[in-house]
A protein has these predicted regions:
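Extended active-site neighborhood of metal-dependent phosphoesterases/phosphodiesterases
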Residues: 63-102
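N-terminal active-site segment of His-dependent metallophosphoesterases
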Residues: 1-64, 70-78
């Protein structure tokens, strides 16, 4: 295993253009890097997926714990899932992307 770093972020809120650019401009890390993401990526599933995919491409291991903004069903989100169904959808998305989540 490549030695790496343990990094942590939260509240990325990528629906804000400045925050989205910050995530898009992250430099690649090493395969041994772990990133802990403590919630509030976005309010729409497509933005959550983009963020997790982008972070996963930069870090060897990504661990994500959803926050209230991630789990809240925004009225303009085309994915109209609420509650447990939304959570399970996000868990399945993480599994597909290779992101660790509870």
């Amino acid at each position: 295993m490549t030695p790496g770093r343990l990094l942590a972020v939260s509240d990325l809120h990528v629906s804000h253009p400045r925050n989205r650019r910050w995530v898009a401009d992250l430099p690649p890390g090493s395969p041994g890097d772990w990133l802990l993401v403590a919630g509030d990526l976005a309010e729409k599933v497509e933005d959550i997926e983009w963020t997790l995919r982008t972070l996963r491409s930069c870090y060897g291991t990504v661990v994500w714990v959803p926050g209230n903004h991630d789990l809240w069903a925004h009225p303009r989100d085309p994915v109209k899932l609420r509650g447990e169904a939304r959570y399970q959808h996000l868990v399945a998305l993480c599994r597909d992307l290779g992101v660790i989540t509870p």
